[in-house]
């Protein structure tokens, strides 16, 4: 157990092995989630999810690298010019950016149905997972990955069962004009 904890501590540090592991995990986990979405022929698939997760992990690694450099290698220069960093800004910008990508997957059909929300949410979750991977928060990453897969694979069946047993009904009606609307509602 002690050796395992030492190994995990080593992988949380900033070194070549840690960076390689984090980027590989981001690529694999993002791709695996995207594969499931692509199998269902959704707007974003294998490569999109892989790139979102990988990009988020890279951003977090860059954030950590900058923080380290400003407090170590660049410390004297940073102090001389009064340079301050806020490592949370990198992650925040990933979340902002993913909003635009997610918005591109959402459409309203001719029947006024909204489609693509799960894809947009999945891209957002994949980006968040990438940030956690980049930070080396492996326990969170593994649990998050499993829960994202569970949400995408198992919960649609639960959702369908709930909808089928519900007593509610959705009726879609389109009107050319509103002339007789009062008669129809009455």
Indicate where each model-derived feature is located.
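Alpha-helical transmembrane segments and their membrane-interface boundaries
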Residues: 1-81, 88
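Hydrophobic alpha-helical transmembrane segments of small proteolipidic membrane proteins, enriched
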Residues: 6-24, 131-133, 138-151
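Alpha-helical transmembrane segments of multi-pass membrane proteins
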Residues: 30, 56-60, 98-105, 148-156
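C-terminal ends of transmembrane helices
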Residues: 31-42, 101-112, 157
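Short, non-helical or kinked segments that cap or interrupt transmembrane helices
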Residues: 39-52, 86-95, 109-124
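Small-residue-rich segments of transmembrane alpha-helices in multi-pass membrane proteins
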Residues: 51-62, 121-133
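Hydrophobic, membrane-facing alpha-helical anchors
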Residues: 71, 89-105
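Canonical alpha-helical transmembrane segment with a positive-inside/aromatic-interface signature
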Residues: 137-186
């Amino acid at each position: 157990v002690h050796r395992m904890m030492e190994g995990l501590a080593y992988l949380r540090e900033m070194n070549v092995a840690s960076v390689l592991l984090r980027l590989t995990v981001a690529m694999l986990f993002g791709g695996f989630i995207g594969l499931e979405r692509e199998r269902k022929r959704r707007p974003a698939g294998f490569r999109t999810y892989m790139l979102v997760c990988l990009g988020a992990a890279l951003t977090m690694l860059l954030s950590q690298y900058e923080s380290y450099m400003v407090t170590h290698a660049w410390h004297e220069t940073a102090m001389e010019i009064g340079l301050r960093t806020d490592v949370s800004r990198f992650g925040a910008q990933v979340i902002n950016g993913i909003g635009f990508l997610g918005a591109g997957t959402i459409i309203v059909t001719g029947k006024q149905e909204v489609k693509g929300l799960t894809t947009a949410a999945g891209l957002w979750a994949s980006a968040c997972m990438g940030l956690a991977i980049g930070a080396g928060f492996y326990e969170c990453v593994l649990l998050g990955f499993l829960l994202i897969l569970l949400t995408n694979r198992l919960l649609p069946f639960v959702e369908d069962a709930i909808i089928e047993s519900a007593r509610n009904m959705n009726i879609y009606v389109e009107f050319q004009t509103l002339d007789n609307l009062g008669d129809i509602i009455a």
